Amino acid sequence: MPRILYKYLDIVGAKCMIGNQNLQFTNASQLNDPFDCHPKLIDYSNVPNTKLQGWIPKEWWIEKEENNALNLRNDTWLCSLSKINDSLLMWSHYCYNHKGICIGLDIDKVLESVPPMFGTIYLEPLVLEVQYQDIIERPNAYHTTKDLFSYQWRTKAKEWEYEQEVRLVIPKPSPIYAAFTPQQAKLTKEIWDWREIRHYMLLKGECFESIY
């Protein structure tokens, strides 16, 4: 994995990131791909009899496992970066039709900047390179050597391979780093879905390596 990773942003997002010197984390349920981090990426249907103990209904067990994976998704925030800075599709999709900015970050210095207790389970984000594959072929949850938590966070369909994504993943980040985006702060909604809230990790100046 390269030391310099890139964040594609529109002008407003770039000004906020550079001006506030922070990195925005979004809830895993709020991403633009509805299959991203979804419990259905993993097959929980082949339940071993040892799990059911002769009396637990199979359907109940499957629902329990999928709900656990869904709760994991809802409790996880992540930041998407890229290994490349010259993807035309990325400039089009994430930089407001090529009118935005791509910021290069030194990932080693980013991890050195993690504020105290940013996460309540892990003290700092996990760095995961996204794996692109046929998501129709789901791993059996009970007969695999894969780390299922990691698999759920890092697996995407092959159609997204052009992004060359690396993710910073933080399960259950501390609420002291939570905030609305500037756009959200202007809204007058009476009820907010807590998953819409962003979390912001403060960065030191030396984290910013380049701007395109």
Residue map of PLM features:
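Partner-binding and oligomerization surfaces adjacent to conserved cores of proteins
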Residues: 1-212
